C-alpha cells in the first residue's frame, strides 16, 4: 500500500513539474511577444495599494474609503440640475493642479464659468479647455490627452451633451435610436485600457432622465447607455438638500446649500457611504465647514455650549467664527485635517510619523553665538 502511495506521489510531482515548466515557457513567450510586464503574478506588482488623488473635500475622501479618486479609473458624477456636479469636478481639477499635475476640461455643454472656476482654486491659466463641436470630437480629444500620459485628470462635462455627429447633421425630429449609447460604448472600450495604463483619472459628469412608464422602482436613469455604468469604478450621486442662510445682515439670504454626495458604486472600497458638504455660492465646498463638523464629531475639536476649542484654547463662538479661525490659521487647519485623516485610515500611522519627523527636521535651528569684544585683537604685519 505504501509503495502504491509513493508511486502516486511521484506521478503527481512529475506531472506538477511538467505543468510548472509549461507555465514558465508560456509566460516567457508572452513577455517576448508583448513585452515585459504584460503578464505577472499579482503579488509581484510593485504597487498593490490603489493610488488615489484627493477629491478636494475631506468628507468626500472619507466616503470614498480610499482617501480620494483612484488613479487610472473612470469616475461618473451624476445628479439633478444645479446640484453641484460641476463644482465637485472643479474641486478635483484644483486638487490635481495643487499636486503639480495637469488637468483638462472637455466642456461639451459650453457653459464653464472661468471666474467661478478660479474662485474654487483652479488655475485657469494652466487648465486645458476644449469645447468640441460633436460628441465624437470631444471623446477623441479626451482619448489623445489620455494616450499622451502627460495629463493627470480629464473631466468631460457632460455625457448628455456629447451629441453624435449624425444627430447634429440631421434635422430636429429625426430618430437616432441608440446612437449616443453606441458612441459611448465604443469610447469606453477604447479608453478603458489607456486610462488604467497612464494612471489618468477620467471624470464623466452626467445628467438625469426619467424612464417612461415606470410604475414601481426608481424611474431615474442617466443618458449614454449602460457602458459608462459598467466601466466606472466610482459613481457619485450628487443631490442638493436644504439652503444655508447667512448671518448678520445676510440672515434672510441664501448663501449656500447642504449637498449630499452618495457613493452608489465603488470598486476600491465599500460603497453606499454618504458625504454631507456645504457648497457656498461663489466659493464652492466649504473645507473649513466640513472640517469643523467632522473634527467636532471625533472630539478633536471640543464644543462646550456655543464655544469651540482646540488643544484647550478657544477658537471661536459659534461655527462661523470657528470656520473663520481655521481659515485665518492654515497651519492649525492642516494639523486638524491630518489627525482626521489618520483616524479614518486615509493616512497610515507610519506615514503620519514620517511627515511629523520631516516637519521637525525642516524647523530652523537657532544657535546663540556670544562674541567677547573685550579682548584686543592684534594684527601682525
From Swiss-Prot:
One Gene Ontology cellular component: cytosol
Listed CDD domains: RecA
Pfam families named among the record's database cross-references: RecA, RecA_C
GO BP annotations listed: DNA recombination; DNA repair; SOS response
Binding site for ATP: 79-86
Molecular function terms from GO: ATP binding; ATP hydrolysis activity; ATP-dependent DNA damage sensor activity; damaged DNA binding; single-stranded DNA binding
Protein family according to the UniProt entry: Belongs to the RecA family.
Protein name as catalogued: Protein RecA
